[in-house]
Every structure is written in C-alpha cells, then in structure tokens.
Swiss-Prot record:
Annotated compartments: Cytoplasm, Nucleoid
Family per similarity comment: Belongs to the YbaB/EbfC family.
Keywords for the protein's UniProt record, in alphabetical order: Cytoplasm, DNA-binding
GO molecular function, one term: DNA binding
Domain of life: Bacteria
Cross-referenced InterPro entries: YbaB-like_sf, YbaB/EbfC
SUBUNIT field: Homodimer.
UniProt name for this protein: Nucleoid-associated protein Amuc_1227
Cellular component GO terms held in the UniProt record: bacterial nucleoid; cytosol
Species assigned in the record: Akkermansia muciniphila (strain ATCC BAA-835 / DSM 22959 / JCM 33894 / BCRC 81048 / CCUG 64013 / CIP 107961 / Muc)
Function: Binds to DNA and alters its conformation. May be involved in regulation of gene expression, nucleoid organization and DNA protection.
Gene3D superfamilies, A to Z: Nucleoid-associated protein YbaB-like domain
PANTHER family referenced in this protein's UniProt entry, alphabetically: NUCLEOID-ASSOCIATED PROTEIN YBAB
Length: 104
C-alpha cells in the first residue's frame, strides 16, 4: 500500500473522530429514577446538563434515600452516554479497539 494513501486515510479518520467527539459533546441522554420523579440529562462526554427532582420524593428526614437515588440515576446517565459514545466511535473506526484516549 502506498504510504501517502495510508497517511491520507489516517488523516480522514482523525477528522472523522474529531467531528464525532464534537457531536457527542452536544448529544444528550436522559435517565429516570423513582418512577420518573427524578430525571438526569447528560452529554455523551459525561457532563450533566439537567437535573429534575419532583418535590414529592424529597423527605428531609430521609436524605439518604434521595442521595442514593441521585447517585444511581446520575451514574446511569453517564453510563448511557458512554455506551452511546462507544457505539458511535466503533462505527467510525470499523470496530478497531483503540487504546484509551484515542477514541472517546
């Protein structure tokens, strides 16, 4: 294979990965907890963008319940975003397993 052709393909892949990362930074996923009374929205690059808590699940005498519910729902949103990002990157790389930090 021609080295120049290979270099051009690598540059095209890098451009595609950069575009995908930019897209994923603005693409959001939402998870719910407590039967929809808690909603967490995050970008696919792991930033929380919205947190909605129905006042009916706030019990000042049981803050542990709300804390645990928040952690579970936030972690679920982050995991969902990572799964979405990984699937998108896999499309671009043709299923190549890239080293950490080279994909998304």
């Amino acid at each position: 294979m021609n080295i120049m052709k290979m270099m051009k393909q690598v540059q095209q892949m890098q451009a595609g990965l950069a575009a995908a990362q930019e897209k994923l930074a603005s693409q959001t996923v939402t998870t719910e907890g407590a039967g929809g009374k808690l909603k967490v929205t995050a970008t696919c690059d792991g930033n929380l963008t919205e947190l909605v808590i129905d006042p009916s699940i706030i019990d000042p005498s049981d803050s542990e319940f709300l804390q645990e519910l928040l952690l579970q729902t936030i972690n679920a949103a982050i995991a969902k975003g990572k799964e979405t990002a990984a699937a998108e990157m896999k499309k671009l790389t043709g299923g190549l397993d890239l080293p950490p930090g080279m994909g998304f």
